[in-house]
Amino acid sequence: MTNHNYKFDTLQVHAGQVPDPVTGSRAVPLYQTTSFVFNNSDHAEARFALQDPEAIYSRLGNPTNDVFEARIAALEGGSAALGVGSGSAAITYAILNIATVGDNIVSASTLYGGTYHLFSGTLPKYGITTKFVNPDDPKNFEEAIDEKTKAIYYETLGNPGNNVIDYDAIGQIAKKHGIPVIVDATFTTPVTFKPFEHGANVIVHSATKFIGGHGTSIGGVIVDGGNFDWANGKFPDFTQADESYNGIKFAELGEIAFVTRIRAILLRDTGAALSPFHSWLFLQGLETLSLRVERHISNTKKIVEFLDNHPKVELVNHPLLESNSYHALYQKYYPKDAGSIFTFELKDKDEKKARDLIDHLEIFSLLANVGDTKSLAIHPASTTHQQLNVEELASAGISKGTIRLSVGIEDVTDLIADLEQALEKI
């Protein structure tokens, strides 16, 4: 499909694929193979030299993965995409692609616990540091930028507090300083928000969540916006000749430079590859993405209203509420609403009561995932954000009494009844 005027609901079903030319299969075939036969020795040489973009080995690329990547790129409005083994791998590769020893990134402090530890604990061991800032004021990002800063990073909706950032302002700051904006858009999906239209240059997703949607597959994806000048003098790995590929200069690849370098270098050398089978499952999920997100959001709005009016609930952290400090930004960037993952706190913020409430839930499952068709609940302070200290938890918007919900697509009256009976028991 080359017509860029197709609407989202059509692209999520068709983008990146035509019926199989050999068999006529309408569904995307699963190419469950490690390797691909070359026509002759010259053909093999051309592929290894990146002169022929077709598949060599499934760690680097696979026809099933190709469809998934093209479809995601189309839905996000990007130039290219790369599927990898997990959302964490997508984030790691996005940073390692542009930063090295002595460099830093500036990141919002409101992050998923695993990402926070990647930035604060793991990447520093490789010489890459992170300056965490309160994202409520865009000036905090600008004040943290120095000559070694390689990117600004944030999540579209912070995990788990649902904070909203002034994306346009951040994009303008990054552009002024000649650095890219890398955005984790897992919680919003391309259904409700398009980061490339608001200053982003690279998007990462945990495809495990809404993209897959059914809690069956692990994977991540990196989307290249094709809208950043990697030859601006700040990124020598893109402008210096890479001798492992006969002197190629990745910046000369233009709008596909970012993901091509990850595929050619990082994926080749460190191998966090996406399984073709998982790509195939993600493609099944994508076909109903907008339909599921619509139900996720409609259910969430009713549950937020229920909890906000419950006498045992002190606070509901969702920006759709007029009382929420992010409501104005939410209205600006999400006119059709977004966010089916949110937190709430009981009246006394008691940790035991919060954990007891979760244990009393019957439909909501206690597990470490979000964006599933099934409704989920968890206690972040003791699980997903356990590695953070008290100050870091507070910076991420989490207390010992915080409960996180990921609202599924079940009948909302059943979900409210489940929450009501659990609240009655504490």
Regions found by a protein language model. Name each.
Residues 223, 343-345, 406-408:
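Short hydrophobic/aromatic beta-strand micro-patches
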Residues 2, 12-14, 18-21, 81-309:
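Conserved PLP-enzyme active-site core in the AAT-like
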Residues 77, 148, 312-315, 363, ...:
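Glycine-centered tight turns that cap/initiate beta-strands
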Residues 120, 147, 348-352, 375-426:
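PLP-dependent enzyme catalytic core of the Aspartate aminotransferase-like
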Residues 270-273, 277-279, 284, 288, ...:
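Conserved small-domain helix->loop->beta segment predominantly found in fold-type I
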Residues 40-89, 114-122:
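Conserved N-terminal alpha-helix of the aminotransferase class I/II PLP-enzyme fold
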Residues 2-62, 70-71:
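N-terminal "arm"/small-domain region of PLP-dependent enzymes with the aminotransferase-like
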Residues 152, 220-222, 316, 342, ...:
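Well-ordered beta-strand positions enriched in small/hydrophobic/aromatic, beta-favoring residues
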